[in-house]
């Protein structure tokens, strides 16, 4: 099966070149899943996200677009997503959840490496700035789990052991 973009339309072709696969209904959710996969792979970008959002400008479409934008595979896109998520209060709970999940979707893990230290440096600020639910989404979804190793585990234990963190049991439990 091959997925490609033709203009603003997604085409699914089987090995014979047929564009329609029997039994496969490509609805809005599947289009977003496929498009986000293309975004992560660097095969689609902002213009395709905008075109799909124009086609599916629903609450679910808004969430999917936020996740797809945060998944764009460039340092500039990751920085923009980080700032929007961590430093602003612009997004709703649902959009924060979708975008923060999209942030970690990468093929090149090097895109996430700059955010390990920044995660721990900003965690307490995030906790104080945002509502509980948004802070919970950010703390869980932005945690650099894809970069898991002994150094990250040690850094996490060290952060949890800080006196100011010990005073916030809910934050410690999330971590």
Predicted regions and their residues:
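Long, ordered, helix-rich scaffold segments
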Residues: 2-4, 8-175
């Amino acid at each position: 099966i091959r997925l490609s973009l033709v203009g603003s339309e997604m085409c699914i072709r089987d090995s014979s070149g047929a564009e329609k696969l029997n039994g496969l209904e490509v609805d809005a959710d599947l289009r977003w899943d496929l498009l986000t996969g293309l975004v992560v792979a660097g095969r689609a970008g902002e213009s395709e996200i905008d075109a799909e959002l124009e086609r599916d400008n629903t609450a679910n479409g808004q969430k999917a677009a936020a996740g797809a934008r945060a998944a764009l595979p460039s340092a500039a896109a990751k920085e923009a997503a980080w700032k929007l998520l961590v430093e602003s209060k612009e997004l709703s709970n649902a959009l924060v959840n979708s975008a923060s999940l999209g942030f970690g979707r990468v093929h090149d893990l090097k895109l996430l490496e700059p955010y390990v230290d920044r995660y721990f440096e900003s965690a307490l600020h995030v906790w104080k700035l945002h509502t509980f639910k948004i802070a919970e989404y950010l703390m869980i979804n932005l945690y650099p789990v894809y970069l898991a190793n002994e150094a990250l585990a040690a850094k996490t234990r060290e952060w949890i052991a800080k006196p100011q963190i010990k005073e916030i049991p809910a934050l410690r439990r999330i971590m």
